[in-house]
A protein has these predicted regions:
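Nucleotide-activated donor-binding/catalytic signature segment of Leloir-type glycosyltransferases, i.e.
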Residues: 241-261
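Short hydrophobic beta-strand element within catalytic cores of glycosyltransferases
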Residues: 298-301
Length: 390
């Protein structure tokens, strides 16, 4: 039980949750588990269909239709159900989690405001090409002036959210990991084989096709006595396209697309792999890269993404300015065993600061601020009402 904060009942609202797999779903599960361990009562509210009994916290799956491809709600029904839940369960805080387009989350944030509930919103995406649309919406509806604490999962994501509205501040509520779940005992590796691994949602923005297209050149420049293999874990709308690309490039047997894997299976895959690579250049955080770094893998990714907040070039991994440099960094680690092992040794023996223990403390601080903000807003509204009395 958390002795510093009275137990809170917290609504964690998101368009998506498990069994769908991605950074936002993994984050939501980790947050709910961490809050439960700290003695609080989180409730996940989502439109994603699935079981409600597989978790140590309540999961409310709304009985509403969603689009097949992206899982978006498109009727008023979910908001009627959410309003009833918010009223019946008397939440202390409502914490909404958004991507770029999150109709359930945005509508729920409005409901929390209308019901006078303390509210926090966390943005899990980089609004690089979309912040202007949010700014127009703010001019129309003034969402950034609501009594809500706005946050993002990294400074990279926060910078674009700040441009999208007129809020006083955007707080940072980062992703996190349980390091001990990823740091498995070292396994004996084949010195003649280099195993590359990536974990991502197979969407266009994640750029799995870019990674696969690098493989022919990597194979051409690979030492003659060394075999190369790439595993891309994940599922999504681009999987058929990636499978066709693998066949067209003749990479069957070199590239494996196993789909969604359980985290324990991914941890075992990390333990026997040599390099983790994440080609996305608009990554809001990159929790899979943090998990791989915690497992002891050198991480290769794009320097313009949020990886730069927890991967230092030459220390935890290598960061590229463009796709050509991404390929060069991979080749350097494929050829240079000592550099690769040096980074891996650092990652295995140096704990990351991005743990759920510290993240939960930060969340609780922001929840307390949200309750204060709600009280301040209500006090100002009461003063205005009294000022208008005859």
């Amino acid at each position: 039980m958390n002795t510093h904060t009275p137990p809170l009942r917290i609504a964690l609202i998101c368009d998506w949750f498990r069994p769908r797999v991605g950074g936002i779903e993994i984050h939501l599960q980790g947050l709910a588990e961490g809050l439960t361990r700290a003695g609080h009562e989180p409730h996940v509210i989502t439109a994603t269909p699935g079981p409600a009994t597989d978790y140590p916290f309540p999961v409310h799956r709304l009985a509403v239709p969603v689009t097949e491809r992206f899982g978006f709600v498109y009727t008023p029904a979910p908001f009627i159900q959410i309003q009833a839940l918010l009223r019946r369960l008397a939440f202390d805080v409502v914490h909404c989690h958004s991507s770029i387009l999150s109709p359930l989350t945005y509508g729920s944030l409005y409901l929390a405001k209308r019901l006078g509930l303390p509210a926090v919103m966390t943005c899990h995406s980089v609004l690089k090409y979309y912040w202007g649309l949010f700014l127009v919406a703010d001019r129309l509806w003034g969402w950034s002036r609501w009594p809500v604490l706005f946050s993002a999962v990294s400074p990279t994501a926060a910078a674009f959210l700040e441009k999208a509205g007129r809020m006083a501040a955007v707080h940072i509520l980062p992703n996190a990991v349980h390091s001990d779940r990823w740091r498995l005992p070292e396994v004996q590796k084949d010195p003649d084989e280099i195993l590359l691994v990536s974990v991502m949602r197979l969407s266009i923005r994640k750029r799995g096709h870019t990674l696969i297209r690098l493989l022919p050149e990597l194979l051409r420049q690979c030492p003659p006595n060394r075999r190369l293999h790439l595993t891309i874990v994940g599922d999504g709308t681009q999987k058929p396209r990636l499978e066709r690309l693998v066949c067209r490039l003749g990479l069957q047997g070199v590239v494996d697309l196993p789909g969604v894997l359980d985290q324990t299976v991914i941890a075992a895959l990390f333990a026997r792999s040599d390099i983790f690579v994440l080609p996305a250049n608009q990554e809001a955080f990159g929790v899979a890269a943090l998990e791989a770094r915690s497992a002891g893998l050198p991480v290769v990714g794009m320097g313009r993404s949020a990886l730069s907040h927890f991967i230092r070039h030459g220390v935890e991994g290598l960061l590229a300015a463009d796709d050509g440099e991404l390929g060069k960094h991979l080749l350097s680690l494929i050829h240079d065993d000592e550099s690769r092992r040096h980074i891996a040794r650092h990652n295995r023996t140096t704990a990351t600061e991005w743990t759920w223990e510290s993240a939960i403390s930060r969340h609780l601080e922001l929840y307390a601020q949200a309750r204060q903000e709600r009280d301040r807003f209500n006090g100002q509204r009461l003063c205005r009402i009294r000022g208008n009395e005859p």
